[in-house]
C-alpha cells in the first residue's frame, strides 16, 4: 500500500480508503518544518486533513504555509478541507459533564463533523445537577450515538446509558482533584459501569471518540 516517505515520517495516503478516514496528524513533538511537510503531503492526497492538540504557535506555522487552515481554539484542532461539501449524517450527540471537559468534548465534535456527521452539543449536564440532563431527555433519546465526556467521578456515561437505547462512547477526562489521579478514577468508573452498551476510550481522547 502506498505511502510517502519524508524521512522523519511515512505518510499513509491510503488510510482513508481502508478505514474511511485519513491519517490524523498529532501536533505535539513536531518541529515547524516537520508539521508543515506532513500537512502538505496530506493535503495533496486527501480532501480533509485533521491536526490534533495544536497550540496557537503550531497553527501559526501551518497557517503561514497553508492559508486555508482553520483553527478551533477550544478543541485545539486544525482542519483543512477542499472539494465539495457532502451532506451530513444526523444522529451524533456529544454531552459534556462540565465546562472544564469542553476541550475534549469539542475535539470529539470536530472529528465527528469532519467524518461527515452533523453533531449536536449538550454542555455542562453533569450528575451534580441531574435535572439539567433530564431537561434534554428527548434530545438524548433521538440520538443514534451519544458521546459522553466527564472527569471527576466519571458517572455521566452510566447515567446516559440508562436513559438511551443508542450506543454510548464514554470519554474520561483528566479534570478533577487529587484522588481523580488525572482521569484514572473516571476511566475505571466508566469501565465498571453497570449500564449496557458503553464503550470507553482513553483519558482525554476526544479524537478517538469522535
Model-derived features with residue positions:
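Short glycine/serine/threonine-rich phosphate/pyrophosphate-binding segments
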Residues: 33-35, 101-106, 130-131, 150-160, ...
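Glycine-rich phosphate-binding loop
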Residues: 135-173
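Long amphipathic alpha-helical segments
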Residues: 1-60, 64-65
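Anion-binding alpha/beta catalytic cores of soluble intermediary-metabolism enzymes, centered on
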Residues: 50-87
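Glycine-rich phosphate/diphosphate-binding loop of Rossmann-like nucleotide-binding domains
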Residues: 88-131
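Glycine-rich oxoanion-binding loops at beta->alpha junctions
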Residues: 77-81, 118-142, 184-185, 204, ...
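C-terminal binding/interaction regions
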Residues: 96, 141, 175, 179-210
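Short glycine-rich or small-residue beta-strand-to-loop segments that form or flank ligand, phosphate
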Residues: 22-25, 91-97, 146-148, 199-202
Amino acid at each position: 500500500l502506498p505511502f510517502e516517505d519524508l524521512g522523519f515520517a511515512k505518510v499513509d495516503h491510503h488510510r482513508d480508503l481502508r478505514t474511511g478516514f485519513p491519517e490524523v496528524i498529532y501536533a505535539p513533538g513536531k518541529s515547524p518544518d516537520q508539521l508543515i511537510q506532513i500537512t502538505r503531503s496530506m493535503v495533496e492526497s486527501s480532501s480533509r486533513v485533521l491536526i490534533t492538540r495544536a497550540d496557537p504557535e503550531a497553527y501559526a506555522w501551518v497557517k503561514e504555509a497553508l492559508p486555508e487552515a482553520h483553527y478551533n481554539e477550544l478543541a485545539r484542532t486544525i482542519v483543512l478541507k477542499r472539494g465539495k461539501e457532502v451532506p451530513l449524517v444526523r444522529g451524533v450527540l456529544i454531552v459534556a459533564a462540565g465546562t472544564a471537559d469542553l476541550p475534549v468534548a469539542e475535539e470529539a465534535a470536530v472529528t465527528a463533523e469532519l467524518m461527515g456527521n452533523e453533531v449536536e452539543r449538550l454542555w455542562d449536564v453533569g450528575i451534580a445537577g441531574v435535572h439539567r440532563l433530564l431537561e434534554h431527555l428527548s434530545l438524548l433519546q433521538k440520538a443514534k450515538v451519544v458521546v459522553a465526556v466527564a472527569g471527576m467521578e466519571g458517572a455521566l456515561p452510566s447515567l446516559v446509558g440508562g436513559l438511551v437505547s443508542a450506543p454510548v462512547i464514554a470519554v474520561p477526562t483528566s479534570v478533577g482533584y487529587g484522588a481523580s489521579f488525572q482521569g484514572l478514577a473516571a476511566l475505571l468508573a466508566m469501565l465498571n459501569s453497570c449500564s449496557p452498551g458503553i464503550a470507553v476510550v482513553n483519558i482525554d481522547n476526544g479524537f478517538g471518540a469522535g
